[in-house]
Amino acid sequence: MADLEAVLADVSYLMAMEKSKATPAARASKKILLPEPSIRSVMQKYLEDRGEVTFEKIFSQKLGYLLFRDFYLNHLEEAKPLVEFYEEIEKYEKLETEEERVVRSREIFDSYIMKELLACSHPFSKNATEHVQGHLVKKQVPPDLFQPYIEEICQNLRGDVFHKFIESDKFTRFCQWKNVELNIHLTMNDFSVHRIIGRGGFGEVYGCRKADTGKMYAMKCLDKKRIKMKQGETLALNERIMLSLVSTGDCPFIVCMSYAFHTPDKLSFILDLMNGGDLHYHLSQHGVFSEADMRFYAAEIILGLEHMHNRFVVYRDLKPANILLDEHGHVRISDLGLACDFSKKKPHASVGTHGYMAPEVLQKGVAYDSSADWFSLGCMLFKLLRGHSPFRQHKTKDKHEIDRMTLTMAVELPDSFSPELRSLLEGLLQRDVNRRLGCLGRGAQEIKESPFFRSLDWQMVFLQKYPPPLIPPRGEVNAADAFDIGSFDEEDTKGIKLLDSDQELYRNFPLTISERWQQEVAETVFDTINAETDRLEARKKAKNKQLGHEEDYALGKDCIMHGYMSKMGNPFLTQWQRRYFYLFPNRLEWRGEDEAPQSLLTMEEIQSVEETQIKERKCLLLKIRGGKQFVLQCDSDPELVQWKKELRDAYREAQQLVQRVPKMKNKPRSPVVELSKVPLIQRGSANGL
């Protein structure tokens, strides 16, 4: 029966993988719902306050760029050639060979530069043209050949063109998507969890599928009780911090994190799913690797380490077991539990795996930085070639002996190693940091320039264009059976109690990596959700000619912000009432759907604007003169933050105004006034009163 359960778990997992690759959106069991277009009023304020409504910020985001592109190509004829030119340059930069770049560079020059020069309509500088022409004459076609044009295209798009985008419906859609992104609160219900694929000191790793996009991930679950029992809180939180540092930017050689969240019992990391097993497993199955095969793995690992080091992260646990293969055979560095940020202070702790730790890591009290990883790289490459660490002779398991040899022994390299390989390993395995390859001031570049890698084009390595030496078998789960992986003994943590103080440690644990969420959405459901939302909004407009009525009321007035909130302010009502609110400098107005009369609350009558909680949801509490109060609830976190800020600012400014006009201060007023005489749309005075 156990065997049958294992087979069924494998089949279910493999089917989910295949369907996710083919049509991930079709696998989505939940649907992303975009908020009403009126969210723009609040979100634009929210983003502006954080410096996010700039050309650079929006253009550099995946969803921002896609909406930008749609607007320019379909609604702004004058910007269309610029966007097309930009995209052709991006395609050129990803070409694999120099031959391809020679042909494509000439085509781009003829179509987008020479054509405009002949028509005397070239909007770019003479320097940019001469830069490209000079290289083409010499038949030099580096990937960044057109970089001056990229900068000038962006400069051209940055002005009036960008302002037209901000005024368009496409920016409204951007605000809708940003609201969704900034209001992500993940739970286990957002994932379909499949079979276990690994186990560590604090928990397990499972294959899983994200419900709203259908994308497959690895879910690393750490048990909070086990963490407490082993006093591993610092390690768990450190891993989350290190993953957040390395998971931004384009790096296909690290197992990156897209999300982190927690439940009362577990900490969960949502990571890139790697289905090909690890190098330790393949070394045991395949036997030692040739120099050529090892070169492939070394090159991809070097780029992964370079990405970390550029972010001032030292990995500290490089070994074959931590190098995972994807289904195509390319590798990523995994498990950042021992990684450390050395940007402000260099570490000096002796951590890592014996046989791979650098001498400076083993020496007590000695500070180190990325130097430690280059020594570990030398040890790992030696193991891939010989089957054991250079400091683990005769299969000894004595850690003290391994450490002693690391600190004192000069590594003897076999005569079978090529001179280029010997040079590389001798450089990496230098005990003296000041003489070690990678530690002489130029980091990874020193290793890339080693004669051992002379045959490689590092751009092609980055683009993963070299064929892997080993491709994991398809249709198999390259992990041990669930029963072989085993499970933790629940008795171990039976006496461990999680207190409020324990949970408080993880208060800031949840995280969404913006660029990875946007990439996930773009690859899966972006077009589908946009099309469905367009249809829904068009249907509402056709059904109700008054759609947009709420927003129209704010036009031409001194309305600070407007949008939907739910209120609970009537002592006879215990249910939330959804209303559309308008904030003016001297009052707050609101009305219900299909209601002509509306109510208002003047700033003079408000005594305070506070944040409160009702059933674990944050709300706004407006205390009114006479002992009354209103409670307002927002649909998302950004809305709550912005309404609180704007209400407090308006209240504060109104108070200052009242202080300057003493006669108005004690004038009695009704706290809430119903404006029932004139329909909302007809009221058009300059100050709205």
From Swiss-Prot:
PH domain mapped to chain residues: 558-652
Domain Protein kinase as annotated: residue spans: 191-453
Binding annotation for ATP: I197, G198, R199, G200, G201, F202, G203, E204, V205, K220
Regulation: In contrast to other AGC family kinases, the catalytic activity is solely regulated by the binding of substrates and ligands, not by phosphorylation of the kinase domain.
Tissue expression as described in the entry: Expressed at low levels in brain cortex, hippocampus, striatum, hypothalamus, cerebellum and brainstem (at protein level).
Domain AGC-kinase C-terminal residues, every copy: 454-521
Main subcellular location of this protein, as a coarse class: cytoplasm
Residues bearing the modification Phosphoserine: S670
Residues annotated as site: Required for receptor phosphorylation: D3, L4, D10
Family matches, as Pfam families: PH, Pkinase, RGS
GO cellular component: apical plasma membrane; axon; basolateral plasma membrane; caveola; cytoplasm; cytoplasmic side of mitochondrial outer membrane; cytosol; dendritic shaft
Recorded catalytic activity of this chain's protein: [beta-adrenergic receptor] + ATP = [beta-adrenergic receptor]-phosphate + ADP + H(+)
Top-level taxonomic group: Eukaryota
EC number(s) given by UniProt: 2.7.11.15
Active-site residues from the entry: D317 (proton acceptor)
Record's keyword terms, sorted: ATP-binding, Cell membrane, Cell projection, Cytoplasm, Kinase, Membrane, Nucleotide-binding, Phosphoprotein, Serine/threonine-protein kinase, Synapse, Transferase
Compartment list: Cytoplasm; Cell membrane; Postsynapse; Presynapse
One function term, GO molecular function aspect: beta-adrenergic receptor kinase activity
Region (N-terminal): 1-190
A GO biological-process term: regulation of the force of heart contraction
Location of the RGS domain: 54-175
Entry similarity comment: Belongs to the protein kinase superfamily. AGC Ser/Thr protein kinase family. GPRK subfamily.
Its biological purpose: Specifically phosphorylates the agonist-occupied form of the beta-adrenergic and closely related receptors, probably inducing a desensitization of them. Key regulator of LPAR1 signaling. Competes with RALA for binding to LPAR1 thus affecting the signaling properties of the receptor. Desensitizes LPAR1 and LPAR2 in a phosphorylation-independent manner. Positively regulates ciliary smoothened (SMO)-dependent Hedgehog (Hh) signaling pathway by facilitating the trafficking of SMO into the cilium and the stimulation of SMO activity.
Comment on protein domains: The PH domain binds anionic phospholipids and helps recruiting ADRBK1 from the cytoplasm to plasma membrane close to activated receptors. It mediates binding to G protein beta and gamma subunits, competing with G-alpha subunits and other G-betagamma effectors.
Subunit composition and interactions: Interacts with the heterodimer formed by GNB1 and GNG2. Interacts with GIT1. Interacts with, and phosphorylates chemokine-stimulated CCR5. Interacts with ARRB1. Interacts with LPAR1 and LPAR2. Interacts with RALA in response to LPAR1 activation. ADRBK1 and RALA mutually inhibit each other's binding to LPAR1. Interacts with ADRB2.
Name the record gives this protein: Beta-adrenergic receptor kinase 1
Source species of the chain: Rattus norvegicus
Gene from which this protein is expressed: Grk2
